[in-house]
Amino acid sequence: MANLINLERVTVGYGTRVLLHEVSLGVADGDAIGVVGRNGDGKSTLLGVLTGEREPDSGRVTHTSGLSVGYLRQGDDFGDASIREVIVAGRPDHVWAADPTTREVVEQLLGGIDLDGSVDTLSGGERRRVALAAVLIGGHDVLVLDEPTNHLDVEVIAWLAAHLSGRTARRTGALVVVSHDRWFLDAVCTTTWEVHSASGKGTVDAYEGGYAAYVLARAERMRLAATAETRRRNLLRKELAWLRRGPPARTSKPKFRIQAANELIATEPPPRDSVVLQRFATSRLGKDVFDLHGVRLEVGEPPRVVLDNIDWSIGPGDRIGLVGVNGTGKTSVLRMLAGQLQPTAGTVKRGATLKIGYLSQALDELDGSDRVLDAVENRRRITELAGGREISAATLLEDFGFTGDKLTTRIADLSGGERRRLQFLRLLLDEPNVLLLDEPTNDLDIDTLTVIEDYLDGWPGTVIVVTHDRYFLERVSDVTYALTGGGRCDLLPGGVDQYLSDRAGDRAARKAPTAKSPAATGAGAGKGESPAARQRRIAKELTRIEGQLSKIDGQIAALHEAMAAAASDHVRLAELNTELGELQRRKTRLEEDWLITADG
C-alpha cells in the first residue's frame, strides 16, 4: 500500500508541555486509524500536523504529490455562506443528486434542512452535520475527522460507520478519526493510535485492530511492563541492601555495581496518569421511584407531542436507556421526571425518598468565575464515602484528574471535558439515589468514560440515561426504550439493534406504501421478524433479565452481611429488613418475567 502521509521525528510543544516528542508515523492507502487518548494529551494537535494546518517545531511531515485531505475540525468558519455553497459548491439539485454517494450523504445528514438557507441560522448540531457532509462529499484521498459523531443520534452514527467502512473496503483513500465513541471506533477502525504522555513528553503508540483489540493489546503491554517493573524492583532491593552493607574499597567490581544500582534507581518508569472516582454514600431509596399514569407531554410552539397517554412504572435499581432521533423529546422526558417540566395531562408520581441527581447537557450550574476547588468545597469540604471513610474536597478532585494547578484554575478556563467531569463529581456529592443523565459522554475522553461506567456498574440506585454513545448505553443500562414519534415510548427487548432494525423497516415501508406489513404480535415484537431474529431477541432479553437477577443477588448478599453487623441495632435492622423484602419482591417479578420470556 502506498504511503500518503509520513511523519518523521515530529515534535510539537504548547507552552511548557511537549505534546508530541519525536513522533514517527505513516498513513497508507486503505488505512482506517482511530486516535484515542486523554483530553489535552494532543489528539487534535496530531490531526493538525497530519493535515498540514499545524507546523511542527521540529521534524518533517510529507504528503504524497497531489494529495487531497478533507479535515473535519471541532469548529467551522463558514460565515454567512449558504448550505448549498458549502456542501455542493452551489450546484442545483438535479446536478448533485445524479451522484448516488452525494445523494445518500445529503439525505442522511441534512434531511429536512433547506439547502438554500444560510449556515449562520443553524443550530450547533446542524452546523456540525453540514461540515461533516461537506467533507464526505468532497472526494478527498484522506479523511481526517475530529469527533465526527458529536450531535449525531445512534441511527445516523450507525449509517456513518457503514459509509466509512465501505469507503475503506473499496481502498478509496485513508481515514484518521478522533472519537470517544468506542462502538464507532470498533466498527470503523483497523488500527488504533494512543496519544499519551510518557516522562512528560507526548508519544503515540500504535495497535493493530479497532477499540476492542486495542484494549486487549494495551492490557497485555501493561502486564508485561508491570512484570518488568517487578523484576527491576526486586533487583533494586538486592543492590540497595548490598550498598547498605558497605562495598569493599579499591576494587573495580563494586564501582560497577554502584553505577548499576544508581541506574536502576534513575530508570524508574513514571506512573501513567490515572483517574479514580471515589464511591460516595447513596441516600436510601424506597420501593417507589416514578409512576406515570395517562401522561401527555407537549413541548414547543406550536405544541409538539412527545408522550401521549403513557403509563410507565420505574422502580428502584432500574437502569434505563432512552433513544430516539434528535428532536423527539428525550431531554424533555428527563426534565419532566426531574420536575422541571409539568405534563400537559396525566400524573407523574414520585417516591417519597427520591433524591434526584440531574446531569444536563448544559453546564449552566457551573460559575465560570469560581475556581475548581472552591466549586467543590462550596458543596462539601469533607465528604463521607460509601465505606464510612472521610475525604477532603482536594483529594477527591486530585483522584478524579484535577491535579496541580488545575485545583486553582477558574472553571471558565477548563476544557469542555474537564467541566463535564467537575459537573459529574458535584452531582454525586449530593448523594442522589436516582440519576437522570442527559448525554453524559459529551466531551469526555475514553479513560474517564470507563471510570464512570465502572462506578455506575456498582451504583445501587436508579439510572435513566439519554446518550448517542452506544457503548456507554449498552454498558450502563439493562433495558432500552425508544421515543418513536406520535407520543409513543416503546420497550425494545432487542436494545439498540432492534431500534435500528425497526427504523430501517419503517423507512422501507414509507418507500413502498402499498406493501403490507404483518402486525406485531405483542409488545416489543419486531416488525415481521424471522424465527431466527425472534430467537436472537428472546436470547438478548433473557440475558438482560439474568444480569438484573445477578445484581439483585449481590445486593441481597450485601444486605445479609449488613444485617449481621447491625444485629444489636433494632432500628437499623428494621430498615435493612424492609430493603431486603423489596429486593426479594423485585427478584420474584424478574424470575416471572424470565419464565414468560423463555416461553416465547
Language-model features and meaning:
Residues 1-227, 281-529, 535-600:
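ABC ATP-binding cassette signature C-motif
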Residues 39, 255, 277-278:
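Acidic, polar-rich N-terminal leader regions of halophilic archaeal proteins
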Residues 167, 217-250, 254-260, 264-268:
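Intracellular alpha-helical coupling/juxtamembrane segments of multi-pass membrane proteins
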Residues 239-248, 276-282, 290:
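Alpha-helical coupling/stalk and coiled-coil linker elements that connect catalytic or binding modules
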Residues 272-274, 346:
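Active-site phosphate-binding and catalytic loops of NTP-dependent enzymes
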